[in-house]
Amino acid sequence: AFQTSFVFQRFYETN
């Protein structure tokens, strides 16, 4: 359950 955090962080940073 770490991929979700990674994707979320990546998406948040990209914003």
Swiss-Prot record:
Keywords: Hemagglutinin, Lectin. The keyword Cell inner membrane does not apply. Induction: Hemagglutinating activity is inhibited by polygalacturonic acid. GO terms for molecular function: carbohydrate binding. The keyword S-adenosyl-L-methionine does not apply. It comes from the Eukaryota. Heterodimer of a 29 kDa and a 31 kDa subunit. Trypsin-stable lectin with hemagglutinating activity. Has mitogenic activity on murine splenocytes. Inhibits HIV-reverse transcriptase. Belongs to the leguminous lectin family. This is Lectin 29 kDa subunit. It comes from Vigna unguiculata subsp. sesquipedalis (Yard-Long bean).
